From Swiss-Prot:
PROSITE patterns: IG_LIKE, LRR
Region Disordered, annotated ranges: 437-458, 498-520
The protein, known as: Amphoterin-induced protein 2
Residue ranges annotated as Extracellular topological domain: 38-398
Transmembrane segments: 399-419
Protein family per UniProt: Belongs to the immunoglobulin superfamily. AMIGO family.
InterPro entries with a match to the protein in the record: AMIGO, Ig-like_dom, Ig-like_dom_sf, Ig-like_fold, Ig_sub, Ig_sub2, Immunoglobulin_dom, Leu-rich_rpt
Residue ranges annotated for the Ig-like C2-type domain, each copy included: 288-378
Length: 520
């Protein structure tokens, strides 16, 4: 006891200050580590925000996972019940949860309260038998739900209520006997659902009188192949209509659409639905309703717009009605403001405005064939005047720029041709030619060098011959050659004498004794 009493006071003095802080950190880490999140369990493989815990015989989610993961894979385990405690940690950033190939038989309310931001949930290949109401109510942003390869035989109408962002729903490989029309009509319909896979169930018929209520963009994504349909001309007409409309749900699985033709209560024969002359179904006995997407029509503000019903059932026995974006019924011979419907199905909009844009549904009802068809047509309204003035302004700017460039080019060419200044060499040459011409005229009148001139003076002087004889000399000139200095004179060279001449030396060539030599 005394030893302990004496050693405890000396312990703080024996530990250095730096080591003391390190020791405190180690103690805190050891105390917190069992309950801390962010560690990777031994049964999982972690890669930053992706965790895979597949085939590890788990019955629930490990509690020490990193809370900011975005993808969690729990496939091939033995999870059997999804309750409020099966995920002990709140994963606020988890967007993909995969729990396929487990033993899930039931899902309780609040099972996904810790994963509110899930966008993709995979519960395929389990043992679910039904989908009850409020089962997925916490998943407000869920976009993809996979429930294929279960034992589901019942879907509550409110099972998917609240999933306003759900786009894809996989229910293939279950035991459904009815087509889930509640997904498209009614209180709990899913407006964004564009893909529904109910293939390979136990659905024997399609509600033809309600399928026409499904919008065209959703109807295109319904997959029905692999179901044991009962052979019926209306079903054949429906699938043929989809096939001609190039719906991928039919064109990609053409040979998987079959039906059973019952010969008696015990024997049946399986037939391909999409084949020519199926059961000799004629157009007069077809009974069904179809819905498809039509074209996009462009209308201009204030200009009359005519929209035709893009239907395939129109003939003399067909009645047409239109439904506007505001659910207003437009019928022939009824006053509906600036709308008018003709008996051939055409819709005329007088003086359309921006408020008239939207999706218009044309419903064609064939009395002879008992066939209804609904076509959705998108009408866009734009202001053509504004667009036209804008384009006209751009065209004017382009034309003006081109014209200005042409005028500038022409002016530059004219300046180059007529206002180009003469170079100095050209000016000197002109002056020299003028000087030579004047000297040529004067040289005819100047006397030749005297005989008594010195040799140096003779060398310095230059003889010049500039005479051009007339071809027809005039009579009375004593055979003399008439000089015409005003004609063209060729000056071979004019060099002034180094000796300056006085005025007395210049005499008229007529009185000069020096003979003239005419050049021919």
């Amino acid at each position: 006891m005394s030893l302990r009493f004496h050693t405890l006071p000396t312990l703080p003095r024996a530990v250095k200050p730096g080591c003391r802080e390190l020791l405190c950190l180690l103690v805190i880490a050891v105390m917190v580590s069992p309950s801390s999140s962010g560690l990777c369990p031994t049964a999982c493989i972690c890669a930053t925000d992706i965790v895979s815990c597949t085939n590890k015989n788990l019955s629930k989610v490990p509690g020490n996972l990193f809370r900011l993961i975005k993808r969690l894979d729990l496939s091939y385990n033995r999870i059997g019940l999804l309750d409020a405690d099966w995920i002990p940690v709140s994963f606020v950033k988890l967007s993909t949860l995969i729990v396929r190939h487990n033993n899930i038989t039931s899902i309780s309310t609040g099972s996904f309260s810790t994963t509110p931001n899930l966008k993709c949930l995979d519960l395929s290949s389990n043992r679910l038998k039904s989908v009850k109401s409020a089962m997925f109510q916490e998943l407000k942003v869920l976009e993809v739900l996979l429930l294929y390869n279960n034992h589901i035989s019942y879907l509550d109408p409110a099972a998917f209520g609240g999933l306003s962002h759900l786009q894809k729903l996989y229910l293939s490989g279950n035991f459904l006997t009815k087509f889930p029309m509640d997904l498209y009509v009614g209180r709990f319909k899913l407006a964004d659902l564009t893909f529904l896979d109910v293939s390979y169930n136990q659905i024997a018929s399609i509600p033809m009188h309600h399928i026409n209520l499904v919008p065209g963009k959703q109807l295109r994504g319904i997959f029905l192949h692999g179901n044991p349909f009962v052979c019926d001309c209306s079903l054949y007409s429906l699938l043929t209509f989809w096939y001609r409309r190039h719906f991928n749900s039919v064109t990609d699985f053409k040979h998987d659409y079959t039906c059973r033709l019952w010969l008696d209560s015990r024997h049946s024969h399986q037939l391909l639905l999409l084949q020519d002359s199926f059961l000799n179904c004629s157009h007069s006995v077809i009974n069904g309703s179809f819905h498809a997407l039509g074209f996009i029509h462009e209308a201009q503000v204030g200009e009359r717009a005519i929209v035709h019903c893009d239907g395939k059932t129109g003939n003399g026995n067909t009645d047409f009605i239109w439904v506007g974006p505001d659910n207003r019924l437009l019928e022939p011979d009824k006053d509906t403001g600036n709308f008018r419907v003709f008996y051939n199905g055409s819709l005329v909009i007088e003086n359309p405005g921006f408020e008239d844009a939207g999706v218009y549904s044309c419903i064609a009802m064939n009395r002879q064939r008992l066939l209804n068809e609904t076509v959705d047509i998108m009408i866009n309204v734009s202001n053509f005047t504004i667009n036209r003035s804008h384009h006209a302004h751009e065209a004017f700017n382009t034309a003006f720029t081109t014209l200005a460039a042409c005028v500038v080019s022409i002016v530059l060419v004219l300046l180059y041709l007529y206002l180009t200044p003469c170079p100095c060499k050209c000016r000197d040459k002109r002056q020299k030619n003028a000087l030579n011409q004047s000297n040529a005229h004067s040289s005819i009148l100047s006397p030749g060098p005297t005989r008594d001139a010195s040799a140096e003076d003779r060398k310095a002087g230059k003889r010049v011959v500039f005479l051009e004889p007339l071809k027809d000399p005039a009579v009375g000139q004593n055979g003399k050659v008439k000089l015409v200095p005003s004609k063209t004179v060729i000056a071979e060279g004019i060099l002034k004498s180094s000796r300056a001449k006085s005025d007395s030396d210049s005499v008229n060539s007529v009185f000069s004794d020096t003979p003239f030599v005419a050049s021919t």
